[in-house]
UniProtKB/Swiss-Prot annotation:
It comes from Artemisia vulgaris. Coiled coil: none annotated. Belongs to the profilin family. This is Profilin-2. Its main location: cytoplasm. InterPro entries: PFN, PFN_euk, PFN_sf, Profilin_CS. GO terms for molecular function: actin monomer binding. Keywords: Actin-binding, Allergen, Cytoplasm, Cytoskeleton.
Length: 133
Protein backbone atom coordinates (compact mmCIF):
# COMPACT_ATOMS: atom_id res chain seq x y z
CA UNK A 1 0.00 0.00 0.00
CA UNK A 2 1.35 3.43 -0.90
CA UNK A 3 1.70 6.23 1.65
CA UNK A 4 -0.82 8.25 -0.36
CA UNK A 5 -3.36 5.44 0.08
CA UNK A 6 -2.90 5.64 3.85
CA UNK A 7 -3.63 9.38 3.71
CA UNK A 8 -6.58 9.07 1.34
CA UNK A 9 -8.24 5.99 2.85
CA UNK A 10 -7.30 6.13 6.53
CA UNK A 11 -6.87 9.82 7.37
CA UNK A 12 -9.21 11.62 4.96
CA UNK A 13 -11.92 8.99 5.44
CA UNK A 14 -15.56 9.55 6.39
CA UNK A 15 -15.56 9.93 10.19
CA UNK A 16 -17.82 7.36 11.85
CA UNK A 17 -20.37 7.52 9.01
CA UNK A 18 -21.09 11.22 9.63
CA UNK A 19 -20.00 12.43 6.19
CA UNK A 20 -17.39 14.62 7.91
CA UNK A 21 -13.68 14.56 7.11
CA UNK A 22 -10.45 16.03 8.41
CA UNK A 23 -9.54 19.33 6.75
CA UNK A 24 -6.06 18.08 5.83
CA UNK A 25 -3.67 15.25 6.63
CA UNK A 26 -0.15 14.05 5.86
CA UNK A 27 2.50 11.49 6.65
CA UNK A 28 6.02 12.86 6.95
CA UNK A 29 9.40 11.38 7.69
CA UNK A 30 11.07 12.27 10.98
CA UNK A 31 13.33 14.61 9.00
CA UNK A 32 10.27 16.60 7.86
CA UNK A 33 10.09 15.27 4.29
CA UNK A 34 6.55 14.75 3.01
CA UNK A 35 5.78 11.11 2.16
CA UNK A 36 2.13 11.75 1.28
CA UNK A 37 -0.42 14.51 1.88
CA UNK A 38 -3.96 15.60 1.18
CA UNK A 39 -4.62 18.43 -1.26
CA UNK A 40 -5.24 21.03 1.46
CA UNK A 41 -2.25 20.18 3.66
CA UNK A 42 -0.43 23.50 4.20
CA UNK A 43 2.98 24.32 2.80
CA UNK A 44 5.27 24.67 5.79
CA UNK A 45 8.63 26.22 6.54
CA UNK A 46 11.61 24.07 7.60
CA UNK A 47 11.78 25.89 10.94
CA UNK A 48 8.14 24.99 11.65
CA UNK A 49 8.91 21.30 11.14
CA UNK A 50 12.08 21.64 13.21
CA UNK A 51 9.96 22.97 16.10
CA UNK A 52 7.58 20.02 15.88
CA UNK A 53 10.41 17.48 15.76
CA UNK A 54 12.08 19.25 18.72
CA UNK A 55 8.87 18.96 20.76
CA UNK A 56 8.96 15.17 20.43
CA UNK A 57 12.56 15.12 21.68
CA UNK A 58 12.21 17.81 24.37
CA UNK A 59 8.62 18.01 25.58
CA UNK A 60 7.49 21.53 26.46
CA UNK A 61 9.56 23.45 23.92
CA UNK A 62 6.48 24.55 21.91
CA UNK A 63 4.26 25.49 24.86
CA UNK A 64 5.64 29.05 25.28
CA UNK A 65 5.52 29.98 21.58
CA UNK A 66 2.85 27.70 20.12
CA UNK A 67 3.03 25.21 17.29
CA UNK A 68 3.28 26.73 13.82
CA UNK A 69 2.37 24.91 10.61
CA UNK A 70 1.91 26.71 7.31
CA UNK A 71 1.96 30.03 9.16
CA UNK A 72 -1.00 29.03 11.37
CA UNK A 73 -0.40 29.13 15.12
CA UNK A 74 -1.82 26.39 17.34
CA UNK A 75 -1.90 26.50 21.14
CA UNK A 76 -0.21 23.30 22.35
CA UNK A 77 -2.44 21.09 24.51
CA UNK A 78 -1.66 18.08 26.66
CA UNK A 79 -0.49 15.19 24.47
CA UNK A 80 1.60 12.13 25.16
CA UNK A 81 5.26 12.91 25.87
CA UNK A 82 7.42 11.92 22.92
CA UNK A 83 4.49 10.32 21.07
CA UNK A 84 1.56 12.72 20.46
CA UNK A 85 1.29 16.50 20.08
CA UNK A 86 -2.14 18.12 20.09
CA UNK A 87 -2.89 21.74 19.27
CA UNK A 88 -5.93 24.02 19.17
CA UNK A 89 -6.66 27.02 16.95
CA UNK A 90 -10.12 28.56 17.21
CA UNK A 91 -12.75 25.95 16.38
CA UNK A 92 -10.15 23.60 14.92
CA UNK A 93 -6.84 22.03 15.72
CA UNK A 94 -4.14 19.52 14.93
CA UNK A 95 -3.00 16.10 16.12
CA UNK A 96 0.46 14.68 15.36
CA UNK A 97 1.43 11.09 16.19
CA UNK A 98 5.09 10.07 16.05
CA UNK A 99 5.97 6.53 15.00
CA UNK A 100 9.37 4.88 14.69
CA UNK A 101 10.02 6.41 11.26
CA UNK A 102 7.26 8.92 10.57
CA UNK A 103 4.81 11.55 11.80
CA UNK A 104 1.10 11.20 11.07
CA UNK A 105 -0.66 14.58 11.02
CA UNK A 106 -4.31 15.52 10.94
CA UNK A 107 -5.84 19.01 10.87
CA UNK A 108 -9.53 19.55 11.64
CA UNK A 109 -12.15 22.29 11.80
CA UNK A 110 -15.73 22.24 13.10
CA UNK A 111 -17.93 20.24 12.94
CA UNK A 112 -15.18 17.63 13.45
CA UNK A 113 -14.41 17.30 17.17
CA UNK A 114 -10.88 17.12 18.62
CA UNK A 115 -11.46 13.56 19.84
CA UNK A 116 -12.47 12.43 16.35
CA UNK A 117 -9.27 13.81 14.83
CA UNK A 118 -7.18 12.30 17.62
CA UNK A 119 -8.82 8.89 17.10
CA UNK A 120 -8.16 8.85 13.35
CA UNK A 121 -4.55 10.07 13.55
CA UNK A 122 -3.56 7.98 16.56
CA UNK A 123 -5.22 4.82 15.22
CA UNK A 124 -3.14 4.96 12.02
CA UNK A 125 -0.05 5.94 14.02
CA UNK A 126 -0.52 2.98 16.38
CA UNK A 127 -0.94 0.65 13.39
CA UNK A 128 2.32 1.94 11.87
CA UNK A 129 4.09 1.50 15.23
CA UNK A 130 2.84 -2.12 15.31
CA UNK A 131 4.27 -2.58 11.79
CA UNK A 132 7.65 -1.22 12.97
CA UNK A 133 7.19 1.85 10.81
Amino acid sequence: MSWQTYVDDHLMCDIEGTGQHLTAAAILGLDGTVWAKSDKFPEFKPEEMKGIINEFNEVGTLAPTGLFLGGAKYMVLQGEAGAVIRGKKGAGGICIKKTGQAMVMGIYDEPVAPGQCNMIVERLGDYLVDQNM
